[in-house]
Amino acid sequence: MTMAPIHVCFSSDEAYAQHLAVAIASILHHRAQEDELVFSVLDGGISEENRRAIAAMTAAGEASIRFLHVDSAIFENAPIQTVQGGVSHVTLATYYRLLLPSLLPGVGRIIYLDCDLVCRASLAPLFAVDMQGSWVMGVEDIDAARHTERLGLERYVCAGVLLLDLAAWRRNGVEKRCLDFIRDHRDRIVLHDQDVLNVVCQEHLSYLERTWDAQACNTRQGRVSGFNALAKTANIVHFIGGRKPWHPG
């Protein structure tokens, strides 16, 4: 029996290229023998040198990769700084995932991953999850209670690990809905594309098991919520927030 390709997507610019490489390497290291991995990178300005290095590493891991240029001008009016004064680790590349239906017209389902994570298991079980009609699946955000109250929602996922039904997105015009929301409700957006996805897809959004996005952070809510403890055994460890493991101190 031939296994379907597992489509995996990242967004990155040059600043996050090294972290992209680590994330891909972790997936390759933990792949099952039968996994056919197809990587797509939404490229916001990765250098030719780094593209070649990442492509060579991926090929050595018997997977394929493509870099797709994205015109960041599409999101020139999208907010990057939050009302709290700014999130320095976020760039416009975070919004690129909203364009996936048109950037990857032949792909029906995809796993979207942030670059600030490591994978510790095969992605095949995640890719095979029964979405039961959902357009978006993700793990409940570590601070979901605050964000659901802020936006008037029932559910709120972390956008760092997503299972997306791109075929459903195309049928329902989700890409356009997201762009329209950015244009018309800019003042409501604090957490960038994550807010946009949760609002636009709220009625067609459901939760993944926590093991697929253990949101490890150096904050009190991280310790209290149990996400940091989960990170010791999780399939994916996601280093959320502004303080990353590679930062000094």
Predicted regions and their residues:
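Glycosyltransferase catalytic domains, chiefly GT-A lineage
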Residues: 1-249
